A protein has these predicted regions:
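Short, solvent-exposed recognition segments
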Residues: 1-48
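Arginine residue identity/basic-tract feature
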Residues: 3, 8, 33, 37-39, ...
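Short, electropositive, low-hydrophobicity segments enriched in small/polar residues
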Residues: 44, 55, 74
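Juxtadomain coupling helices with adjacent low-complexity linkers
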Residues: 50, 67-107
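A short beta-strand signature within small-molecule sensing/ligand-binding domains used
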Residues: 50-58
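Short alpha-helical scaffold segments that flank and stabilize functional sites
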Residues: 57-59, 96-97
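Short hydrophobic/glycine-rich mini-motifs in sensory/regulatory modules
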Residues: 59-69
Length: 107
């Protein structure tokens, strides 16, 4: 999710493959970053660890973002729809956190 905060030029190489689902194509990574920016959250299935899906959102208090919150869920206990439904409230929570941090003078 933090890579989606960067420009296309700043995302010069994909992350090392951790599983068979890790995005290793730079073009696919750029497409995923664009989709993340459009949705306001990132979603992945078994890209980082087998059996785990994750939804994440940037805490929008720095440019580019340096902080994020994620929710990891077991693949065999979570549907695609449930994972999608997690993204919106997660993005709302990170936005709320950013506002609270600013009011407290932390960011």
């Amino acid at each position: 999710v933090l890579r989606a905060e960067l420009t296309r030029e700043e995302v010069a190489d994909p992350l090392p493959a951790l599983t068979g689902n890790t995005l290793v194509s730079l073009e696919v990574l750029h497409e995923a970053c664009a989709a993340t920016r459009e949705r306001g959250c990132a979603a992945e299935v078994e890209e980082s660890a087998p059996g785990v899906r994750c939804v994440a959102a940037v805490v929008p208090c720095r440019l580019p973002g340096t902080d994020a919150i994620s929710c990891s869920m077991p693949v065999d206990q979570t549907t695609d729809a449930q994972a999608r439904e997690t993204g919106e409230p997660l993005a709302e929570a990170t936005t709320d956190l950013a506002h609270r941090l600013r009011r407290a003078g932390i960011r």
